[in-house]
Curated annotation (Swiss-Prot):
<keyword id="KW-0486">Methionine biosynthesis</keyword>
<dbReference type="InterPro" id="IPR027514">
    <property type="entry name" value="Salvage_MtnB_euk"/>
</dbReference>
<keyword id="KW-0479">Metal-binding</keyword>
<keyword id="KW-0862">Zinc</keyword>
<keyword id="KW-0028">Amino-acid biosynthesis</keyword>
<feature type="binding site">
    <location>
        <position position="201"/>
    </location>
    <ligand>
        <name>Zn(2+)</name>
    </ligand>
</feature>
<feature type="region of interest" description="Disordered">
    <location>
        <begin position="1"/>
        <end position="29"/>
    </location>
</feature>
<dbReference type="GO" id="GO:0046570">
    <property type="term" value="F:methylthioribulose 1-phosphate dehydratase activity"/>
</dbReference>
<keyword id="KW-0456">Lyase</keyword>
<dbReference type="InterPro" id="IPR001303">
    <property type="entry name" value="Aldolase_II/adducin_N"/>
</dbReference>
<comment type="function">
    <text>Catalyzes the dehydration of methylthioribulose-1-phosphate (MTRu-1-P) into 2,3-diketo-5-methylthiopentyl-1-phosphate (DK-MTP-1-P).</text>
</comment>
<dbReference type="GO" id="GO:0019509">
    <property type="term" value="P:L-methionine salvage from methylthioadenosine"/>
</dbReference>
<feature type="binding site">
    <location>
        <position position="121"/>
    </location>
    <ligand>
        <name>Zn(2+)</name>
    </ligand>
</feature>
<dbReference type="GO" id="GO:0008270">
    <property type="term" value="F:zinc ion binding"/>
</dbReference>
<dbReference type="InterPro" id="IPR036409">
    <property type="entry name" value="Aldolase_II/adducin_N_sf"/>
</dbReference>
<keyword id="KW-0963">Cytoplasm</keyword>
<protein>
    <recommendedName>
        <fullName>Probable methylthioribulose-1-phosphate dehydratase</fullName>
        <ecNumber>4.2.1.109</ecNumber>
    </recommendedName>
</protein>
Amino acid sequence: MQNVQQPKKRKLSDEIIAEDEDYQRDPEHPRNLIPEICRLLYSQEAMTGSGGAISMRRNDKIYVAPSGVQKERLQPEDMFVINDDGDTLKLPLNGKICRMSQCTPLFLTIYRLRGSECVIHSHSKRAVLATIISSGNEFRISDLQMIKGIYKRTENRNYRFGEEVVIPIIENTPTDPELQENLVKAMENYPDTCCVLIRRHGLYIWGTTWQQAKLMYECYEYLFDIAIQLKQLGMN
């Protein structure tokens, strides 16, 4: 009887390699999008001095920008690939020596609590100033057209003109992982929010798609800028 050779079962590493090869043909692969958006935010002075990071989910894999690198020079090959448990599936390609972002535990927490597909962390000057001019643990703003670009999670719709957007502010800590406990509390206490501000540090923003996260980031930045200028003018 002739032996029938069984096809070889693909290993997880083979699947990762096959999927990663797609980035050379797919401009919306996380390996391409993360460097592109990092360069954009660098040009807006939100990711200078190696600060900030972006993470995106693609199927069951999570792509994370490395830490301590010049964000405007990131390349597709520089990304870490991890799973939902934080296990490293793939290191940066071409033998590059990079460090996993300190934001990774917070990215994983946001994915777990919100089911997001993209998380942006930046050291935006507008976000920092917004936390300084806000005396309490919240940033509040209303009656501006750009509020309509912010997603209201519990009602599965965007905010309407005239509604008030409330963003929680948590206190900064010596390291990013130490922010996790207060980040979780803020997300639980403010179920509508897609943003958490960190006093004198920056912000985390997330969305169900990378497009939503990026658009909301831009809307939040606009709202922070208006609030800062109103404060300078002595207006509410």
